[in-house]
């Protein structure tokens, strides 16, 4: 591999992140507007979870664009190659933003899973108090905060990272990323624990959410107090949350497995180096579309906005006029 070919994907990644940033923010802000203005009363409590997830995903999109990092594993170190606007503020800011990026990504996954847990508890108990809702949301920030804080308790030696990276990847042209950052010792307690939290989150969150989703659907089917329409809308929402939970599995597990393979064998996987950062935040770009489709009031609002949904006010007027001729008292009963 020549030094030139090692950066052949970079122009495409640059274009992607521009589309990702402006498109992602637009869709998330549209979703936030729908949550605030089109949520029916039945979604009043659920709205807190939706707003929380939307807010976190806006931050994640911003951090992904701010860093635009490429991940380059070494034998005993890990290089983070930023190409985003963070470079204007120096290596320390880029490395700090990278930690926040990982922490917020974990918090997004926990937030979506937390929404499913809330639906499960609401169906079982009938009502969840407002204080319990805020407690549930607050608890999801604990693992994420630990993931963010841990690296700041360890020493940073970017010069050593750069030296080791150039030695282990002599054919790579890394000048476009200078001065890049990273972990100089991946065997440290801080790096190991933070990585463990992220791995547990990637595997445990979908597993637990999948189980709870099946339980939620079972409870909805057994609920005799719900109308058929409410049951269908509730199940549709549950399916949407399940999609949001399992989307990260598709994005995370393949690239994470390739990263472990590259770390253990020292085999350079150029595409995976870029995809590791891209796919961690990619679900935040897609999630609004899942919400637009699976949350029925939002879908109806968008269809109404683009005039794709057939409205029935004319039919209602005709029916009322027809009935009024036969029985005027139906129209004016007072």
From Swiss-Prot:
Chief subcellular location equals membrane
> What Pfam families does UniProt report for this protein, alphabetically?
7TM_GPCR_Srd
Q: What is this protein called?
A: Serpentine receptor class delta-55
Can you tell me where the transmembrane regions are? 15-35, 46-66, 98-118, 133-153, 191-211, 241-261, 276-296
Can you quote a single GO CC term? membrane
Gene name tied to this protein:
srd-55
Leader sequence segment = none
Q: Where in the cell is it found?
A: Membrane
Q: How does it sit in the membrane?
A: Multi-pass membrane protein
Q: Which family does it belong to?
A: Belongs to the nematode receptor-like protein srd family.
Q: What keywords would UniProt list here?
A: Membrane, Transmembrane, Transmembrane helix
């Amino acid at each position: 591999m020549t030094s030139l070919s090692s950066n052949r994907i970079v122009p495409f990644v640059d274009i992607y992140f521009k589309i990702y940033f402006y498109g992602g923010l637009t869709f998330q802000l549209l979703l936030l507007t729908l949550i605030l203005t089109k949520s029916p009363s039945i979604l009043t409590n659920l709205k807190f979870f939706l707003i929380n997830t939307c807010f976190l995903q806006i931050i994640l999109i911003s951090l992904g664009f701010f860093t635009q990092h490429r991940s380059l594993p070494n034998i005993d170190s890990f290089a983070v190659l930023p190409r985003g606007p963070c470079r204007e503020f120096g290596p320390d800011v880029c490395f700090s933003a990278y930690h926040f990026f990982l922490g917020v990504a974990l918090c997004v996954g926990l937030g979506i899973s937390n929404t499913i847990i809330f639906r499960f508890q609401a169906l079982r108990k009938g009502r969840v108090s407002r204080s319990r809702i805020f407690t549930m949301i607050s608890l999801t920030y604990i693992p994420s905060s630990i993931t963010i804080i841990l690296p700041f308790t360890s020493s940073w030696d970017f010069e050593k990272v750069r030296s080791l990276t150039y030695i282990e990847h002599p054919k790579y042209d890394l000048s476009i990323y200078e001065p890049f950052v990273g972990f100089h010792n991946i065997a440290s307690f801080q790096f190991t624990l933070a990585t463990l939290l992220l791995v547990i989150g990637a595997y445990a969150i979908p597993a637990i959410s999948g189980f709870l989703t099946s339980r939620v659907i079972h409870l909805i089917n057994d609920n005799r107090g719900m109308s058929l329409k409410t049951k269908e809308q509730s199940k549709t929402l549950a399916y949407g949350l399940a999609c949001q939970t399992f989307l990260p599995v598709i994005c995370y597990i393949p690239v994470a497995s390739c990263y472990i393979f590259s770390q253990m064998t020292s085999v350079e996987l150029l595409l995976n180096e870029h995809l590791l950062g891209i796919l961690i935040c990619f679900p935040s770009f897609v999630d609004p579309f899942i919400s637009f489709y699976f949350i029925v009031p939002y879908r109806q609002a968008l269809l109404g906005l683009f005039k794709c949904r057939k409205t029935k006010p004319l039919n209602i007027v005709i029916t009322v006029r027809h009935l009024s001729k036969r029985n005027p008292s139906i129209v004016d009963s007072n």
